[in-house]
A protein has these predicted regions:
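Metallo-beta-lactamase
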Residues: 67-114, 118-121
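Active-site metal-binding motif and surrounding structural segment of the metallo-beta-lactamase
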Residues: 19-65
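Short, glycine/acidic-enriched loop or turn micro-motifs at the edges of active sites
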Residues: 17-19, 46, 131-132, 153
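Conserved small/polar residues in nucleotide/adenosyl-binding loops
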Residues: 181-188
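Active-site neighborhood of phospho(di)ester-bond hydrolases with catalytic His/Asp-centered motifs
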Residues: 13-16, 37-44, 66, 125-128, ...
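Conserved beta-strand hairpin/beta-sheet module of binuclear metal-dependent hydrolase folds
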Residues: 1-29, 113-128, 146
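Active-site-proximal loop/helix segment associated with metal-binding centers of metalloenzymes
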Residues: 100-176
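Short, well-ordered alpha-helix to beta-strand connector turns
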Residues: 36, 81, 144-145
């Protein structure tokens, strides 16, 4: 979970921790879930949606997600249809003082996306859980002031870790998480 705040607009990107932890983290910033302008969901996997059901049960927050993600979330979120604002890769929409751009990622999920958030002269790009950086993602992230890039993939740790063989193969596949070796230091200039 990540909070992007600017000019009175507070966007929660994913809700991968419990609703209680989200509330505690927001409280440290002087915020409550009712202060959130929206929740942006990248995909349906539990590590991105664990706190979503409880959060939405008590707080009617607009939820932006793709149709593919909504399809998989619907059985777990009875209130989904009342708060869902469907988005699609390549779309852009305003939330408060921010302009949000949606771009596709490569992940083994229903319809995985990530986001660029522009507000005034500043731009933040978020890129998580992608097996590689698709061209539309690279284009959307070009020129951002801050790039939040998940880079916790370690092939040796994965191979020697406790996961079942089938999960290891899935993660090691092209649509698994991006490895820090795929975006080397000298390549970052092309995105910033």
């Amino acid at each position: 979970s990540l909070l992007v705040s600017a000019d009175g607009t507070d966007l929660l990107v994913d809700a991968g921790i419990s609703a209680r932890r989200i509330k505690q983290s927001l409280a440290l910033l002087g915020l409550t879930p009712d202060d959130l302008s929206a929740i942006l969901i990248s995909h349906e996997h539990t590590d991105h949606t664990a706190g979503l059901a409880t959060l939405l049960k008590h707080h009617p927050i607009p939820l932006y997600a793709t149709g593919g993600t909504a399809f998989y979330l619907r059985p777990r979120l009875p209130q989904l249809d009342s708060c869902l604002r469907p988005v699609s890769p390549g779309s852009s929409f305003p939330v408060g003082s921010a302009q949000v751009t949606v771009f596709a990622t490569s992940h083994d999920a229903g319809e995985s996306v990530d986001y660029r958030v522009d507000c005034g002269d500043a731009a933040v790009g978020i890129l998580t859980d992608t097996g590689f950086v698709p061209e539309p993602a690279a284009a959307a992230l070009t020129g951002v002031d801050l790039l939040v890039l998940e880079s916790n993939h370690d092939v040796e740790w994965l191979r020697s870790g406790p996961y079942p063989y089938s999960l290891k193969q899935r993660i090691l596949g092209q649509r698994g998480p991006v490895s820090y070796t795929h975006l080397r230091a000298h390549e970052t200039d092309s995105y910033l």
